[in-house]
């Protein structure tokens, strides 16, 4: 994933619910990963988290740090081969890939993982 595309999935904890909604709308995947100024992963937020927050409080100006999941699932670069298993085990559709310093370097999506496996399987049949 190119850096420009990766940035559409990253947001800082100080940004508001409205800003998060705009980014989620733009990336069309229903999720954002919260990073600190060093781009280290510190949380995740989904469109469902935002919907539940709005039903509960109605506050669009709150910082996303108030409602983010502070323990998001992730894999390190060397563990990418296990990404599909992690997604299946935790019923998640997006999984950030971290380097050894905990910096987000890529995001894997469930549909893309299935496509890669399916295409790989087909090429073995030839």
Q: Which positions does each model-derived feature cover?
A:
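A short, polar/charged loop-to-alpha-helix boundary motif
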Residues: 49-64, 112-123
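N-terminal start-of-chain detector that recognizes signal peptides
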Residues: 2-6, 14, 38, 45-48, ...
